[in-house]
């Protein structure tokens, strides 16, 4: 088996380079180095870690355009999307620096239960050790910083495994981390072969795994990890609900931004649209009108809104889901056009609620519309999926918003916004097969730490 792999630009298949997998012996050496680095990390003060993360934020800002260009070349996402990603990565680094200074324990009196004994408990948060951070292709730098930042802030060491498609951007990111002051025995980059993944996940020197990606890979990680702490951010089948009192102009803009941006390749994309019957035709017509004007093409051009999906295989999967929906009775309001790895923005009507495109995660620029009469009608349809990440609703009725908040199986409901809403200091994560644990810098620090108690 070859120890190298080649990468191409999804837009035009131009070569991006040839890279080497990390041999198993090197992985073991990296883990030994990181285990040794835990000792020095424990002696590094929180304000020192915060200083490193602030320096990293400054470097990310300085190299933002260079990194955004790499992201676009690697993933096919538009340069506009990549620039937004770099802004988010900068924010995540700043937030990690701020939260590094806020890791605080508590003291507890023991007299709440008899016999009290006059003791006091001092509870502190301690790092887990070495965190294996695994990131997907679609937000290679932003998600990496959402893992590396809080892991480092908490005092852990990090083995960073990016998606293979993102090798060049990951190499630049690690270089910037070193330049910011992270020692090499605190952060290592690896690109293991597929055959080595299970034993890497099971390795005794990996103390926890922080993974963002698909459910199948997460199942393999869980099976190999044993009793390791897991933070899993997985897929979503996120609904956007438009009530008859919702702002249609804002709702159509949100639908487009939360579905067709990044060519629909985001776990929090608006993958299913539920439109109240009283405004269905008006919403559909406005949505089709706006979507038909989106520029599809070269992702390096500033006016391009939709680039290619990550590869031809991904495009074929989306096409299959669309064709199955049409076979199930759906009609095409817009799109259903394909060119290489391009899937043109597609809007489907009359979609069966049991069609695969409504039940499974569709990772591409396709938007199924469902007309409904009442909230009670759609709650079981929305919940009829293995996922439960986020949701969005457009309504002026607080009672409706609260009912959806209580009844939907999701981690977040965004009122008068799309399901893709996320900011660095909010908790992020879902229920069911959308994952385990919560990201968001403060919450991720807790996930990658444990409590240690001194009784005196």
UniProtKB/Swiss-Prot annotation:
Keyword check for Oxidoreductase, yes or no.
Answer: yes
UniProt catalytic activity: sulfoacetaldehyde + NAD(+) + H2O = sulfoacetate + NADH + 2 H(+)
Q: Output the Pfam families linked to this UniProt entry.
A: Aldedh
Presence of keyword Oxidoreductase: yes
> A Gene Ontology MF term for this entry?
lactaldehyde dehydrogenase (NAD+) activity
Q: Which residues form the active site?
A: 233, 267
What is the uppermost EC class here? oxidoreductase
Question: Which UniProt key words apply to this protein?
Answer: NAD, Oxidoreductase
EC number of the protein: 1.2.1.73
Q: How does activity depend on pH?
A: Optimum pH is 9.0.
Q: Which parts of the sequence bind NAD(+)?
A: 213-218
How it assembles, according to the record, is: Homotetramer.
Q: Which family does it belong to?
A: Belongs to the aldehyde dehydrogenase family.
Q: What is the protein's given name? A: Sulfoacetaldehyde dehydrogenase
The gene is: safD
């Amino acid at each position: 088996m070859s120890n190298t792999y080649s990468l191409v630009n999804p837009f035009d298949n131009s070569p991006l380079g040839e890279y080497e997998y990390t041999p198993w012996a090197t992985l073991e050496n990296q883990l030994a180095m990181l285990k040794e680095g835990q000792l020095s990390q424990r002696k590094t003060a929180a304000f020192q870690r915060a200083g490193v993360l602030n320096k990293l934020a400054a470097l990310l800002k300085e190299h933002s355009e260079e990194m955004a260009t790499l992201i676009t070349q690697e993933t096919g996402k538009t340069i506009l999307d990549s620039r937004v990603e770099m802004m988010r990565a900068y924010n995540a680094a700043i937030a990690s620096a701020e939260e590094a200074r806020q890791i605080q324990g508590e003291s507890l009196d023991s007299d709440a239960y008899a016999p009290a004994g006059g003791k006091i408990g001092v509870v502190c948060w301690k790092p887990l050790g070495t965190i294996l951070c695994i990131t997907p292709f679609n937000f290679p730098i932003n998600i990496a910083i959402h893992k590396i930042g809080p892991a480092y802030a908490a005092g852990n060491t990090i083995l960073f495994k990016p998606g293979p498609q993102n090798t060049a951007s990951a190499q630049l990111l690690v270089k910037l981390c070193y330049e910011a002051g992270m020692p090499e025995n605190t952060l290592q980059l690896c690109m293991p072969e597929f055959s080595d993944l299970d034993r890497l996940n099971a390795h005794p020197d990996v103390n926890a795994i922080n993974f963002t990606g698909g459910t199948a890979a997460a199942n393999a990680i869980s099976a190999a990890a044993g009793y390791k702490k897991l933070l899993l951010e997985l897929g979503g089948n996120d609904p956007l609900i438009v009530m008859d009192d919702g702002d249609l102009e804002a709702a159509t803009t949100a639908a487009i931004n939360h579905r067709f941006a990044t060519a629909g390749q985001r776990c929090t994309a608006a993958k299913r649209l539920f439109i109240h019957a009283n405004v269905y035709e008006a919403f559909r017509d406005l949505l089709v009108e706006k979507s038909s004007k989106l520029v599809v093409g070269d992702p390096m051009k500033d006016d391009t809104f939709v680039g290619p999906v990550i590869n031809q295989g991904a495009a074929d999967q989306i096409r299959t889901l669309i064709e199955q929906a049409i076979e199930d009775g759906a009609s095409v309001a817009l799109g259903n056009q394909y060119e290489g790895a391009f899937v043109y923005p597609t809007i489907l009507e009359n979609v069966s609620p049991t069609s695969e495109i409504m039940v499974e995660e569709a990772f591409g620029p396709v938007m199924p519309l469902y007309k409904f009469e009442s909230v009670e009608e759609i709650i079981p349809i929305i919940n009829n999926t293995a996922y439960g990440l986020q949701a969005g609703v457009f309504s002026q009725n607080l009672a409706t918003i609260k009912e959806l908040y209580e009844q939907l199986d999701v981690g977040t409901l965004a009122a008068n916004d799309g399901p893709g809403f996320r900011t660095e200091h909010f908790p992020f994560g879902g229920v069911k097969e959308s994952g385990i644990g919560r990201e968001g810098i403060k919450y991720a620090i807790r996930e990658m730490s444990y409590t240690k108690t001194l009784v005196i």
